[in-house]
Amino acid sequence: GYRPVIRGGLGAVSTQASVNLKLGNLALRPMDQGYSPDKVMSKLRVDDPQFDYRQVGIVSAENVISVHTGCNTRPWAGHLTGQGFIVMGNVLAGKNVLQAMAEAFEQKEQVDLDERLLGTLEAGRDAGGQATADGTHLNERSAAVITHGQKDFGHIDLRVDASEAAVD
């Protein structure tokens, strides 16, 4: 599962693997008080007893990032970061999935953000997507593309939950 939360002019927080539905809003509150994403992540690490089971990504409106992949998330799990972005995943075919996603995002700078994000998800799927530990392919069950402006309303909010072909 996953839980993205975005606040215009402030930033975005996404939690996945073992999701705490309150974590996104708990992370945005201190950011609203001036905490950096790294400081927020440190606070979450201390306050959340299940933190090692989660993946958490934070991107501020200024493109400052912090990311965590817990040591108890289901393999293959990891994350990569780039200039103002994070790609992260769990139960993946391997690191190559994240590498393909990062490359797709970086190569499409001239494309609208929503299309760029969709292309990034498709690149991950095409690179092997999700898989069991023995390499058996799993269909992506959920996906989201959410973009936000400076105001408190979204531009795009596309979500697919509990589907056999979430990225298709």
Locations of the language-model features?
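N-terminal nucleophile
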Residues: 1-168
